Amino acid sequence: MIKVNTGGGKTIDGLVILQSYLNEGLGPALYVTPGGGYMETQLLDEAHNLGIAVVTDPDDAKYLRSEAIAVVNTHKLFNGRTVFSEKRVSAPMAPIGSVVIDDAHAALSTLHQTLSLSIPSSSNVFIPVIDLFEEDLKQQSADSLADIREGNYESALLSVPFWAIRHKADRLRELLRSEATKYGSSLYWPWPAVQEVLAICRIVITSREIAITPPCPPIGHVTAFSQAKRRIYLTATLSDDSVLVTDFGALPESVAKPITPLTAGDIGERMILAPQEINPAVSGDEIRKEVAALSRSYNTVVVVPSAPSRSRWAAYADEAPTTNEQIVAVVKRMKSGVHVGLVVLTNRYDGIDLPQDACRVLVLDGLPGSFSGDERLQSLLTSRESGVDDRQVQRIEQGIGRGVRSNEDHCVVILIGPRLAKLTIDPRTLKRFSPATQAQLELSRTVTTSMGAKPIGEIMDTAKQALSRDSDWVRLAKSKLHGIAPQPGFVSQFAAPLRHAFDAAVMGGFVTAAKLLADAVEAEDDVKLKGWLRQQHAIYLDQIDPSQAQDVLRVARTENTHTLRPLSALTIRTIATSDDQADTCARRLTTMFASGSSAIRLGFEEMLDDLKFDPARTEEFEAALLQLGLVLGFESQRPENEIGEGPDNLWSLGEGQYWVIEAKSGATSTKIGKRDAAQLAVAELWFKKRYADTCTGLPVMIHPANTLYKDATAPVGAKALTEAGLKQLTDNVRAFSVSVAVVDRTRSEVIGRLLADHKLNANDLASYLAPIRG
């Protein structure tokens, strides 16, 4: 593995290395780019400038005779019908002697797509697959299954239990085979590789697609890659290289000892500003207006995670290319010295080089997201107890490297959103960035520490210092990077067991696979990750001892509530509030948030940012609602999430009073429908069965509307938290956070006064609700 700072010339390194292997007689030589189109074009131009012979067809005689390097993208190498497999039907396998995987971390998303199955809702087999697992899915969550079938909430997802997959693998295979043989089907390219391991795949279902994904990519199917004499991985200086082991099958001992530059400080100059960390009161729209003003003088690139995020820039964007061809054309203009202005790119955190004046201002607006159901579930499962998803940190690191492509380059990086701002100050996430990026983040914080709650205009004046090449800033920026030592490669302690267990299972060695994962569980300290690993253990154990696998899964569920629900019924404790609300609130303000006024404000903003009506983020809404209840000093639960039945959220307000909450934050209808109203009635019944007659549960529906359709009936006395009520509540919580940030939050009498001042006492909450009307 070769680690070079972003912009450090990995492409040239890779081409020269392969040419040297050809000179040694270790051909044929293959260069793999993470994507096609623009990235391939860049590489071919680079090879031409170096005088290195390249072709784009691995069946080309020049490649086969080791006279030229073949350049292909990740999709060409890794797929079920790859020309590099010994199972190739139309011709002999294309051999590989030496291979370079460029920007290996960036190639992973393509690798996952081409070695897993995605069945869109338009497919002929979409409904039959759901029908096949109907009863198994109901056991996980009948409500989520109904949401998926009706397509009401795009964020609804379900995972098929592994024991059901084992039991019905042959029937599933028969269902999929006819579709997989159709050229043009989404199953056509990956099927030959995935069908070999279908019985141990995970299956995640949403209203848009069914994702069928092996525990690790089955790269053994790509025979020539597995048999290559030399495999070189080119990566940026990211802090976690575990995925090279789990996904590419790289040797952990090689990954742990990468070839690196003499210093990690050979990166370009970056001032990295998170305005909302400096002043949490600054809004995203205020920052966007200031960025738009900068773009009149400097080429500016904004990277957003999704199309809805892109729409926030519609009023400011000069260009918003979406296709590869459009992106190539815009980037070419920017590189030619033309002032293009403000360019918005969607989900392009890697693969685009923007040196010098092509990009002087780079903006990341929002945390990189997970869009497929499987990606979302894996993010929930593998986020640490701190909430950190290592893959997001890697994508941020890749993204902020787009604007500096040499150690002489410079760029201002602006981060928008409370989550991004929090990542830059939380020690648990800061350490997951590369040494150079950590140093630049710390320097930028040092420069802005004295600014306090300055308005956005003054914050942006700091950016102008770097852009105008202020001599004091330039000198300080260079000194901060001097002498930074490169890090060794980091491989998590569970990476090798995950890969080795999968490889053993592919060969039928389920006893070995289960033992490897059992040992990995015992070695892990993070409770959430331990639960995820324990579920992986149960998947392999189920193949040889289904009963014991259920016992293992039952423990996993106590450690990580996003794991599967076991066959036997789960229980959930009843909750009650015994302590004074102010006492509990004061205690949790201390334990749930980092110290410092900015950290408190950012913690609240991160939570409030999720408390919005959004069809794509209902899981995040419910998690934030749980957190809000706890922060305000109540007891709070998510019964439906924990045991598969009951309300979405349950708040205990004290003195026997409860809110029984059905959260329909993904609803877009103008009235409350029959099924949503029925769910609220079922949730109320669940509460009455489990709580004493002395307890009162108020049925609360979170919905844009408080009016029922004619065929719908709500429980007697039911209330709605509408958009207006939710906004009033979150506005008051935000004002409360401003006050809390500047007082002694350990003093319950102070917190009690602030709760009362902001109408957040238990007795005040009813004022945010509206009656549900017929």
Where are the regions a protein language model picked out?
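Conserved coupling segment at the C-terminus of the helicase ATP-binding
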Residues: 1-5, 95-98, 103-298, 305-313, ...
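Conserved Walker A/P-loop ATP-binding site and its immediately adjacent core
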Residues: 6-55, 76-79, 237-244, 303-310
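SF2 helicase motor core recognition
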Residues: 9-11, 78-91, 102, 107-109, ...
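Inter-Walker segment of RecA-like/P-loop motor cores
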Residues: 40-92, 325, 329-334
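Catalytic core segments in nucleotide and nucleic-acid processing enzymes
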Residues: 307-310, 326-334, 338, 364, ...
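Long, largely alpha-helical accessory region at the distal end of helicase-like NTP-driven motors
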Residues: 308, 406-534, 743-774
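Conserved RecA-like P-loop NTPase helicase motor core
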Residues: 333-422, 667-668, 704-705
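Interdomain/boundary linker segments immediately adjacent to catalytic/signaling cores
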Residues: 553-556, 562-616
